[in-house]
């Protein structure tokens, strides 16, 4: 039996860009509020997986960056990137120092990733609550630090 025949593709990749077929960003239901806590049009780099980064626009949009070679994110991975040609896009919302992001990736037939965290000066910390049978509730922190890399 063909199990994959019943999977619904929610996203598509065209010209290196991943987009949802029918956008359903839940975060767009949250009213947008301007903030001065983020630095716009610059890349925040994941401190553990340095091949990943996030860039914020002042209007609530974001781009998620990946290293082309699988190693550290470089200027060449970011240059000439804008909303229209970014591999992955999403949205952000803030409430004080708290931030929520949501972005779409085409893996697993298309998935929306949602993260919550807080803005701390030139860094953003996202928290994920996990359960370990040995330790119980565990909170994993993922740090993104502001870099010198910029985009349009």
Annotated model-derived regions:
Residues 5-89, 95, 100-152:
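Lipid interaction determinants
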